[in-house]
Amino acid sequence: MEQTLDIKANKVKETVGRHVLADGFDFVMDIEKSHGSWLYDKQTDREYLDMFSMFASASVGYNHPYLVERSEWLGKMAVNKPTLADVYSEEYAHFLEVFERVVIPEELQYAFFIEGGTLGVENAMKACFDWKTRKNFEKGLQTEAGICIHFKQAFHGRSGYTLSLTNTSDPRKYQYFPMFNWPRILNPKLKFPITEDNLEETIKNENLALVQIEEAILMNPDKVACIIIEPIQAEGGDNHFRDEFLLGLRRICDDNEILLIFDEVQTGIGITGKMWAFQHFTAKPDIISFGKKAQVCGVLANKEKFDQIPNNVFRESSRINSTFGGNFIDMLRFQLVMEVIEKENLVENARVVGDFLLESLKALAEKYPEKISNARGRGLMCAVDLPSAAQRNHLMNELFNDGLIILPCGDQSL
């Protein structure tokens, strides 16, 4: 039976705001009329071109025909919410088959699912803390390893362990909450275009960052379990790193029996022109976190590396777990999304269209060098800098008024 909605569009924010902070976008989304990359505003009967994609989580836009075609099945599945860690079904097994075929990289065969990208990151960290601590015990050391090295301008989440990592330009997201004082390292981000001077500055910062990491390890013997980095720092400013730097991280991890985490919550599932952003690089992680475009969140880990500890968290019951073991309906939605990605070759499409977008942004930067700079990107994950935060915000508001939704990042980037 079709549900009748008796709340008018002009009363939506008022109704929501009675109990929830309703200070988001100034439109009311029409769920049924939104389509592709277009959001439909029920208040004004106006369409907005969506270039924020629900904070990088809308994998194939809105009301994709294939998902709409399967909506009756998806709705039927949504009636129940099984606890997947202990209760299994044919539908769950089929999701995992598609997930394995389309998404899981050869080097990361262990999987763990949970609700929320932050918890994906946190459980990646827990897996590393456990692994390194047990490594210490094997050597006769009684030292528990509970330190995670991370980088400036990182965003890894808003709760638990991740609060000790997040340090982007908006302090409201982490200030006054209790945190661990873990080593925070200079992020040697690239500046574009990559001129001789810019590259020299980047290499100098890379060397400094690697020295800072080695010093942190020396000051905390056997206590550092992991290094975590976003392959592209998203909210921190769409900051890119050289393969040479990531290889430096890989070397330090290998030399010190430390695990390397790549946080792929925002960079994963094709947006960079590869399924995972780390696949652009020679350096490989031991474990990644995922979420957003994957609908369900979690981690993928290197089985060979973690199996150096026989009772690692992926083999010992209840070391990492949650009631629902992910989210059943999110998994099934993502199953359909993966089938669309596969059938329509959308990862390659992101690479091709992303190349066009980046070249267009570079052309704008050349045409208006006093207004736009530092054009950068991989695939469709692109950004530019404005001269100041105020000018960035003004442009963002003007674009919204013209019917385009885009997000800020870093201090002055779009």
Predicted regions and their residues:
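Conserved N-terminal phosphate-binding loop of PLP-dependent enzymes in the Aspartate aminotransferase
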Residues: 1-414
